[in-house]
Structures are given as C-alpha cells and as structure tokens.
From Swiss-Prot:
Keywords: Cytoplasm, Magnesium, Metal-binding, Nucleotidyltransferase, RNA-binding, Transferase. The keyword Magnesium applies. This is Polyribonucleotide nucleotidyltransferase. The gene is pnp. GO terms for molecular function: 3'-5'-RNA exonuclease activity; magnesium ion binding; polyribonucleotide nucleotidyltransferase activity; RNA binding.
C-alpha cells in the first residue's frame, strides 16, 4: 500500500463521505480515516504473523468512544474514559457480525479491528462510518479477508424509505434498520420498528442493500488503488487419513446419539461417543495435536449429521417438524413483593422477567456521544451459568448479555405508553433460568407478561421467536423456534419480535455468504405464524394489563404549575423542596414546562405534598378574602399566614374600626381572623385589612336595619 496520503470521496445520503489513507496509523496492517460530514472515525486492522494454537478464529472488534469527539470531559474523579459504554459494546457487535463470516475456515491468525471515534456529527452515524472503515481497513491490508462489506441505516417517513436519516428524521421514522452485507447478499440485520408489516420490513432491507452495493463498489476502487497483496497463510486442516478412521469409528453411533430428543440426554449420548473415540487414541499415546484434530473431526461429524437430518430427512434433533414450536407454559404474579413478574417457558428454555416501576427521577442518565440524555425504559438480561448446568465465575454482564438486553428493549419500546399517559420509569430484568436456544425471545415474552402483571397499559402485547436455516446447495430448510444445537450448527439466527399488527424488532446473523430475498420472505412469514401462536398462548394466561398497580408500586400524581413558580417550589439551594420531601416522604420531579410529578407508595402523602405545592405557587389577588392565622405580632401590626408559605401584614390601623393602641388588645398569636387583601406592593409584600371587612359587615347590618324599619 502506498504510504502517501490519498483521499477518496463519494456522496452518501446528501452528505460527503471521504476516505483518507496513507497518513495515520501506518504500522497497522491496514488503516483508514473515514470522514462523514463532521464525523471522523479512524479504523485499523492488525493480524498476528503466525496462527494461534486454538480451535476457533480469534477475531476481536472494538468500537472505541472518546468524549472529546463531542467536546466533553469525562465525569468522575479520574477524568478519563473507563469501560466501554453500552452503546460502544453494541456498535462493536454490529461491526463484528457482518465481517466474521468472511474469513476462511481454518484461518487461526489473531485479528484485531479497532475503530476510534474522534469527531461526531450527530446527523452522520459514527457506527456506519466505523463499519465501512473496518471493512476497508481489512480490505486494503494484507490480511486475507473475503470482503468488502458495507452497512446502511434505513428509515421510513410517510411511506418513503430514507438512507442514513438525520436525528430529526429518525424521530419521525417508524423504522430504524441497520442492514449489512456483501455486494451479492445480506448477512446482518438489526432493526427496531413501530409495529410494521413484514412485507414493509423486507422492502426496507432490500432498499438498504442497493446502497450497500454502491458503497462496496466505492471500496473496491480504493482497494484497487492502495490495497496490499494478501499474505500467504496456512489454513488449519485435519489429517485426511485420521479423519477417515475417526468417521468409520463414530459416524453410525453419532447418528443415533443426535436423535435423542431431550437436550441433556442427547449431550450425554454425543459425549459418550466422543469420549470413546478420544480414549481409543489416548491409549495409543498420540500427541496432543492429534487429539485436538480428533475433537475437531468429531465436531464436524455432529455438524454434518445434524444438517443432513434436517435438510434431507427433514428430522430435527428433538423430533419436531420444521415449523413446530416447543411446548409453552407461562405464569404471572409469582413474586409477591415485586411490581410485576412473568415466567415464560418454551421447551427447555425458561425466562423469569420482573417489572419495576419508579418515579421519573429514576431514569437512566446517559453520558455518551449521542444526543439522548436519559432513558425511562430499560430492559436488562442476565444469563447465569446454572441455566445451562455449568459452573463459572459470576461476573458483570458481557457483550452477549448487553446485546440481548438491548434487543429486548428495542422490541418492547414501541408499545410502552408515553410519559404523559404513564408517568413512570419502567425497568425490566430478565433472568434466564434454563437455556436451550432462543433465550432473548423468551425474555421478550416474559417481559410482556411482567408488564401486564404490573398494570403497565401497553399499546399491544409483544412476543418473539427465533428462526433458523440449514442450507445445503440449492436445498434449504427454515426452522421455527430453534434450539441451541440448531443455532450453533445452522446457517442463520433470525430473531423476530412483534405484535399481532406487525414487527417491532429484527436481528439476523448469517454464517454463510448471504441470503436471497426469497428465503428472507419465507422466514419472515413463517416467523409471523409462530409469533401469533405464542401471542395466543400468552393472552390465555393474562388477557390484558391489570387495571390496578401493585400495592407496592409507587403512586404518581401529576400537576401543572406556572414555570415562573418553579424556583419558589425548589427554594434557595433546594431548601423548600427538600423540606416537602422530608415532611411527606415523597419523590418530586419537576419538568421545565411546569409539570410536577409527585410519587410515593402512600397516596395520602402524595396529596399532602400536592397541597403544599399548590399553596406555594398560589397567587394572592387584591380583593380576595382569606381566613388566616396570626403568626407574628409586631408593634406596627400582625403578620397573618394566608396559606402555607404566604404571609401578609395587617397594619395596626387596619385591625379594627376604632383606634387600636396595642396590637395584642385585638389579636393574639394563633388567632384565626378574616382579612382582605388591599394591596400588593412593588416588592411583592401583601398588605391586609381586617377593618375593611368589619366596616362592610357594619354597613350590611345598618342596611338590614333600615330595610326592617321600612
């Protein structure tokens, strides 16, 4: 590759996309600076010179955020970026998924792809720039990569598809789709949608693929100009004679073991065959490398046999038909003190989801590169080791758990009621208790049940299902509700979530070169049938959201005040609002438009806090009459509390009809007296009169007597 700086440009969705090579990170195998609008991402690709002694392809993809990209200094004491944000982890997965299938089988050199976000223009996606940059860094390098690939985001406004929508357009769009692939086929889809029909989603995917073809042609021009010659690598291969011997020893027994229906019994049967073959070679005292090859051949036999059974004999490992869903079972309300809970079981996959309702002050604060500052709906996914009968250290969530949590969040968000209709923060936690495939979709179903149990007025219930594909030449079989073995050994993992009306989320990963439109269309329609079956089951357990919230959930009341009065409610240094909170035990959240949310488990305390706030913001009007309490007495008059937080002065001359020598002769502290507002001066001080009311009363009496005499 030339070491001189070279620049290549193309128009992308009305904004200029520029690629710079030969200036930055020249010691990497491949490096490009992608400029899209004012977004700038440096993408690099490096590889080890020798293959690693592992039985998998060691690829690492990192999407690194830098807060200087949006002119921010990190918070906290250390003042530097720490662990990756959730958004950065999701972006890393987004880039990893389309490039991973495009490395040759048997390639074991360690490869690292790093994209550093250096400048962010919110209207020009840094994730799409990083995906393009990652593909191009690999393509121009000497690393053997069977790309390039490209990605595009697709939105839809008023029925019209848009490529790479701006922030403003995204707010109006009912589809948020990321599609990636090669020039020939799609190999990755990630989407959220507002109950959009399957046919529309398919059209959006195809629309995005047309833009991908254009971006790949652009990359091919750059590779032609600056690309390096690919390095010679030795792909890992097993010994042909050894493979023949192992197959003769294991194939027949493996065929029988694979068809054991129950997961653990099947695993035990397969392991028994494996252990018998490995023991045979251990007795011969062969080298560790040979034993490693034996294990790989056995894995290959299992994979081939599972795929042959599905495509040729139309038999699934657990005996189901291709479109058959495992037995379903669900319950709600199984945890008495939580706000809502739902248990969803599909075969040997089980998820327990818990819904917690909080005040709006419980929103998640986001401090990243995006425009979003907070989040009032969250879905978290946990996958403990006991769910698959294993032991391993209990650590924080990994990339997979964060990805599955985000998928569930995206699937459910379109049906969450607006803040105006339901002023709560909603947090869902899905605990995977058993796993045999499709746990992310089970968590979506469990979360829907939990929210309905909690009384969240969902726009519609959501269910999810995972589809699979096994393709051999021109023959293929689409599988509904894939289990773990079918996911691991198949060619596609296609997750579809939605309501009866349409799709709310899609996630597709392909292990082969890509998929045609026909297969995608068939998979979407088969998924719809499965989704409707699951929805019918869920609605038989709980037909609609509960009318009442849990007694343990906070009750929220909403009121509106004059925005100019917000400072009065808060008080100097928060003194006033903290006093209300201390007195009532409620939570108070105030919006800039004057909307006030008061929340507490105790509704009486909510009402008490509301009354205090109403008194604070209440406007005193000249001419109004109040029954007030004498709070303080001075020589010149008495201070009377009209309502909470508002006092006025009755001057000594306004206390009585006759001349008053001493204030205490008329009123004492604690007395309740009727007063009339006669003036509010320029400083906001309220002047009151008791004398005016006494005079009015006297005049009424005189008028009454005169009327009687007549």
């Amino acid at each position: 590759m030339s070491q001189e700086k070279q620049v290549f440009s193309i128009d992308l969705a009305g904004r200029q996309l520029t690629i710079e090579t030969g200036q930055l990170a020249k010691q990497a195998n491949g490096a490009v600076l992608v400029r899209y609008g004012d977004t700038a991402v440096l993408s690099t690709a490096t590889a080890s010179k020798e293959a690693k002694d592992v039985d998998f392809f060691p690829l690492t993809v990192n999407y690194e955020e830098r807060l200087y990209a949006v002119g921010k200094i990190p918070g906290g004491f250390i003042k530097r970026e720490g662990r990756p944000s959730e958004k950065a982890i999701l972006a890393s997965r987004l880039i990893d998924r389309p490039i991973r299938p495009l490395f040759a089988d048997g390639f074991r050199n360690e490869v690292q792809v790093v994209s550093i976000v250096m400048s962010v223009d919110q209207d020009c996606s840094s994730e799409m720039a990083a995906m393009l940059g990652s593909s191009l860094a690999l393509s121009i390098s000497d690393i053997p990569f069977e790309g390039p690939i490209a990605g595009a985001t697709v939105g839809r406004i008023d029925g019209e598809f848009i490529i790479n929508p701006t922030v403003e357009q995204q707010e109006k769009s009912d589809i948020h789709l990321v599609v990636a692939g090669t020039k020939d086929a799609i190999n990755m889809v990630e989407a959220g949608a507002d109950q959009v029909p399957e046919e529309t989603m398919l059209e959006a995917i195809m629309f995005g693929h047309e833009e991908i073809k254009r971006l790949i042609a652009f990359q091919e021009e750059i590779v032609q100009a600056v690309g390096k010659e690919k390095m010679e690598v030795k792909l890992y291969e097993v010994d042909a004679e050894l493979e023949k011997a192992v197959r003769e020893m294991a194939e027949k027994d493996m065929h029988t073991a694979i068809q054991v229906h129950e997961k653990h019994a099947r695993e035990d049967a397969i392991n028994e065959v494996k252990q018998r073959v490995i023991a045979h070679y251990e007795e011969q005292e062969v080298e560790a490398e040979v034993l490693g090859q034996v294990s790989e051949i056995l894995y290959k036999i299992v994979k081939e046999e599972v795929r042959r059974l599905i495509t040729v004999e139309k038999i699934r490992p657990d005996g189901r038909k291709s479109d058959e869903i495992r037995p379903l079972a669900s319950e709600v309300g199984i945890l008495p003190r939580t706000h809502g809970s739902g248990l969803f079981t599909r075969g040997q996959t089980q998820a327990l989801s818990i819904c917690t309702l909080g005040a709006l002050g419980d929103v998640q604060i986001l401090d990243g590169l995006g425009v979003e500052e907070s989040k009032r709906f969250m879905h978290h996914y946990n996958f403990p080791s006991f769910s698959v009968g294993e032991t391993r250290p209990m650590r924080g969530p990994g990339r997979r758990e964060i990805g599955h949590g985000a998928l569930g969040e995206r699937a459910l968000e379109p049906v969450i009621p607006s803040e105006k209709d339901f002023p709560y923060t909603v947090r869902l936690v899905s605990e995977v208790l058993e796993s045999n495939g499709s746990t992310s979709q089970a968590s979506i179903c469990g979360s829907t049940l939990a929210m309905m149990d909690a009384g969240v007025p969902l726009k519609a219930p959501v269910a999810g299902i995972a589809m699979g594909l096994v393709k051999s030449g021109e023959h293929y079989t689409i599988l509904t509700d894939i289990q773990g073995m079918e996911d691991h050994l198949g060619d596609m993992d296609f997750k579809v979530a939605g309501t009866a009306k349409g799709v709310t989320a899609l996630q597709m990963d392909i292990k082969i070169d890509g998929l045609s439109r026909e297969i995608l269309e068939e998979a979407l329609q088969q998924a719809k049938v499965g989704r409707m079956h699951i929805l019918d089951h869920m609605l038989s357990v709980i037909a609609e959201p509960r009318k009442e919230l849990s007694e343990y959930a906070p009750k929220i009341i909403t009121m509106t005040i004059n925005p100019d009065k917000i400072r009065d409610v808060i008080g100097p240094s928060g003194k006033q609002i903290n006093k209300i909170i201390e007195e009532t035990g409620v939570k108070i959240d105030i919006e800039q438009d004057g909307t006030v949310f008061i929340s507490s488990i105790d509704q009486q305390m909510n009402e008490k806090a509301k009354k205090i706030i109403e008194d604070i913001v209440r406007e005193v009007q000249v001419g109004e009459i109040y029954l007030g309490k004498v709070k303080r007495i001075e020589k010149f008059g008495a201070f009377v509390e009209l309502f909470s937080g508002k006092d006025g002065l009755v001057h000594i001359s306004e206390l009585a009809l006759e001349r008053v020598g001493k204030v205490e002769d008329v009123v004492k502290i604690g007395d309740e007296i009727s007063v009339k507002v006669i003036e509010i001066d320029k400083q906001g001080r309220v002047n009151l009169s008791r004398k005016v009311l006494l005079k009015e009363e006297q005049e009424k009496e005189v008028a009454k007597e005169e009327a009687t005499q007549e």
